[in-house]
């Protein structure tokens, strides 16, 4: 069967895609920028990639009309823009209007659990999207999930940040809100199980794990699984804004996402009973086992997707290709080169940069820069990296975004997502003469940009000099 997969670079789609291919489906992947999609790693003739932006109806003509079903996995929660509800509504309308002209008999939509009239903006937007999709001429199957637990999921990584960094927590009262977490493995089983299953047509289902817990209990259970001590005190007067700052400064989330999460976490998300898991033969994974499975993936360096790879920079929203061509004019440069004797070792070191491995020189200065970035509302250094030795275009790498990761050409190009009065690139390249080239490029924005460059210039002298030396030494 021919399946359309939207949001193909996203957390859920990257987990679902290998399952669809294993089930011998032909999959058409929709992406805004094909350079963010690592096509080669799948090595399958059953996959094709098309560039589609559902906010731009004219781009939808790239979608083939002979599809049998479509997954709607488009989500605007991570965007920094304030009108994400309008973006989600427009995307859903454009999707519906085009898909109902195709041969698709089913659309599958992954939403959030909706069981209260007083919904958060996020859940209200999800419900509105469901209504729009349900008005199409195809059959809609909606799966509503709560907290998703898996390596790289937003909920898992935020809980991990809190538990591993704060042995004592003074926390807001929404930690007493009840939720029903679900393992990412079960989510994928449900998504693949309902595909072209006529018993699920024009139905909606809440999906969750076997455990109903407060967020406080989830944190304590996580600590117990990891063998960590944790004490949590609840403060009833912590405002939503203060709660958002609490999440923002302690975890790797952006402030805009923290606001939306706090808004949603005040609402109980408990599944309404249904027979879907019995119909599909799915065995729910406990919260504890979901945590253990996530860490098994992390320890084996097998994290196929991460929520941190979602674009948080409005600058890059239209695609990374535009910034893959590093500007030459009107820029400041810090360029260094060094002859190397072991290019493969050096290349491995370049491909392992950031995250737990650090930046090979002056890590404490990078940490300070990341902290300053957080203070000004940036992403900071806490995003780390998904895989310790592999890297792909579009991935987040601390406060950088990977633009080019071409191992054959021995070139890595990064774009800064930190708060800056301008735009910055960092490039590593090994040429045919075994010379390592390291170039930091900064395109200033006005007078403040120029003042910024000269203020950090003294630090560049020894940071970049030490960095290239330690990389070149292999």
List each model region and its residues:
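Conserved beta-loop-beta element that borders a ligand/cofactor-binding pocket
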Residues: 131-152, 158-161, 165, 170
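Terminal "cap-and-tail" regions of soluble proteins that handle hydrophobic small molecules
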Residues: 289, 295-341, 345, 364-371, ...
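Glycine-rich portal/gate segments that line the openings of hydrophobic small-molecule binding cavities
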Residues: 331-332, 339-344, 351-419
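NAD(P)H-binding glycine-rich loop region in Rossmannoid oxidoreductase-like domains
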Residues: 35, 39-102, 112-118
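N-terminal Rossmann NAD(P)H-binding glycine-rich loop of SDR-like oxidoreductase domains
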Residues: 3-25
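Substrate-positioning beta->alpha
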Residues: 154-155, 174-195, 203
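Beta-strand/loop substructures that line and gate deep hydrophobic ligand-binding cavities in soluble
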Residues: 415-459
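Mid/C-terminal beta-alpha module of Rossmann-like enzyme folds, strongest
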Residues: 2, 194-257, 268-334
């Amino acid at each position: 069967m021919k399946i359309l997969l939207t949001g193909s670079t996203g957390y859920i789609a990257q987990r679902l895609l290998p399952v669809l291919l294993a089930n011998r489906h032909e999959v058409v992947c929709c992406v805004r920028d094909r350079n963010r999609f690592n096509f080669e790693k799948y090595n399958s003739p059953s996959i094709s990639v098309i560039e589609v932006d559902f906010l731009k109806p004219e781009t939808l003509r790239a979608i083939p009309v002979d599809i049998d079903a479509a997954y709607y996995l488009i989500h605007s929660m991570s965007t920094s823009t304030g009108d994400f509800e309008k973006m989600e509504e427009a995307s859903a309308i454009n999707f519906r209007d085009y898909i109902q002209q195709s041969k698709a008999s089913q659309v599958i939509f992954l939403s959030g659990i909706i069981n209260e009239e007083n919904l958060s903006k996020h859940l209200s937007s999800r419900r509105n999207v469901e209504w729009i999709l349900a008005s199409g001429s195809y059959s809609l199957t909606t799966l509503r999930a709560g907290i998703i637990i898996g390596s790289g999921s937003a909920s898992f990584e935020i809980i991990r940040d809190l538990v591993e960094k704060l042995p004592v927590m003074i926390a807001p009262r929404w930690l007493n809100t009840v939720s029903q977490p679900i393992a990412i493995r079960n989510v994928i089983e449900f998504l693949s199980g309902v595909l072209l299953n006529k018993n699920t047509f024009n139905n909606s289902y809440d999906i969750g794990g076997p455990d109903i817990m407060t967020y406080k209990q989830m944190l304590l259970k996580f600590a117990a699984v990891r063998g960590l001590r944790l004490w949590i005190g609840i403060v009833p007067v912590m405002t939503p804004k203060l709660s958002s700052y609490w999440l923002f400064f302690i975890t790797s989330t952006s402030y805009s996402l923290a606001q939306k999460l706090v808004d949603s976490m005040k609402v109980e998300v408990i599944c309404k009973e249904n027979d879907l898991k019995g119909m599909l033969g799915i065995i729910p994974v406990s919260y504890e086992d979901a945590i253990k499975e996530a860490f098994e993936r992390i320890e084996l360096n097998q994290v196929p997707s991460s929520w941190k790879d979602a674009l948080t920079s409005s600058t890059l929203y239209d695609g990374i290709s535009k910034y893959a061509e590093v500007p030459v004019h009107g820029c400041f440069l810090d360029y260094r080169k060094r002859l190397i004797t072991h290019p493969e070792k050096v290349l491995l070191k370049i491909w392992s940069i950031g995250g737990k491995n650090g930046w090979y020189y002056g890590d404490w200065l990078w940490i300070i820069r990341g902290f300053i970035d957080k203070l000004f509302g940036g992403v900071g250094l806490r995003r780390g990296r998904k895989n310790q030795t592999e890297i792909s275009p579009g991935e987040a790498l601390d406060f950088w975004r990977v633009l080019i990761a071409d191992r054959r050409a021995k070139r890595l190009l990064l774009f800064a997502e930190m708060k800056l009065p301008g735009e910055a690139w960092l490039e590593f390249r090994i040429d045919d003469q075994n010379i390592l080239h390291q170039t930091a490029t900064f395109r200033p924005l006005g007078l403040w940009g120029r003042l910024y460059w000269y203020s950090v210039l003294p630090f560049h002298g020894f940071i970049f000099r030490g960095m290239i030396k330690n990389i070149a030494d292999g």
